[in-house]
């Protein structure tokens, strides 16, 4: 991981710096493979961490997690440590049980440069009143997606949306689902930017739920 430097007066980025057009162009982890309740999960990569968004359809008896790790390691820490999650190791594989929907990180040998975040959230179905839908298995480039009154934005599990979301003086907005909103096109590599990733100004009755938000140029929301 390169050193990240905060710039209080970053160079303005007026247009997205790049686009992605297929899942083949998305950055995937080559360090971790994750399975939850027998279902293989997509594991994404950034230069600061790896992450696996997991949409859970009902907790039932919790979540059984298996992680296959491609490099040798000795020590493992699952955080927050206050959760008291115990793991079982077999060679390069870890297994543990999450008693409910929660978000945890897995650290290897105290290395904070490549943790794995397992981000569990309840599965959110597409509402009938959806006005903007990003579908599973597709990559989108929205630059700045401007919302209006009563917009319902649905990011389906398995969708990746590159860009940011903006609204001003709007009412009854929803941004929901289990997909990913990625703000990396809006800042220079290894530096911050000036724009909020989800920028909702003087809006009323706003719901944001379920989505995974990463790599913002500034504050996420």
Stretches with model-predicted labels:
Residues 1-221:
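Extracellular/periplasmic carbohydrate-active domains that bind, remodel
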């Amino acid at each position: 991981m390169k050193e990240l430097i905060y710039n209080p007066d970053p160079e303005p980025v007026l247009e997205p710096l790049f686009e992605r057009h297929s899942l083949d162009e998305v950055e995937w982890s080559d360090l971790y493979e994750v399975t939850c309740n027998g279902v293989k999960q997509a594991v994404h990569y950034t230069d600061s961490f790896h992450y696996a968004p997991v949409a859970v359809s009902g907790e039932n008896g919790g979540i059984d997690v298996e992680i296959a790790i491609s490099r040798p390691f000795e020590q493992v820490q699952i955080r927050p440590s206050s959760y008291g999650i115990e793991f079982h190791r077999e060679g390069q594989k870890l297994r543990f049980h999450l008693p409910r929907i929660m978000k945890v990180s897995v650290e290897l040998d105290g290395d904070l440069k490549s943790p794995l975040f397992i981000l569990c959230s309840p599965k959110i179905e597409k509402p009938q009143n959806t006005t903007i839908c990003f579908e599973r298995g597709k990559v989108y480039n929205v630059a700045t997606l401007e919302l209006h009154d009563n917009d319902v934005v649905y990011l389906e599990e398995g969708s990746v949306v590159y860009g940011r979301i903006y609204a001003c003086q709007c009412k009854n907005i929803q941004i929901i689902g289990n997909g990913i909103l990625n703000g990396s096109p809006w800042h220079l590599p290894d530096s911050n930017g000036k724009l909020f990733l989800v920028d909702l100004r003087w809006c009323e009755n706003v719901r944001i739920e379920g989505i995974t938000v990463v790599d913002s140029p500034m504050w996420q929301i």
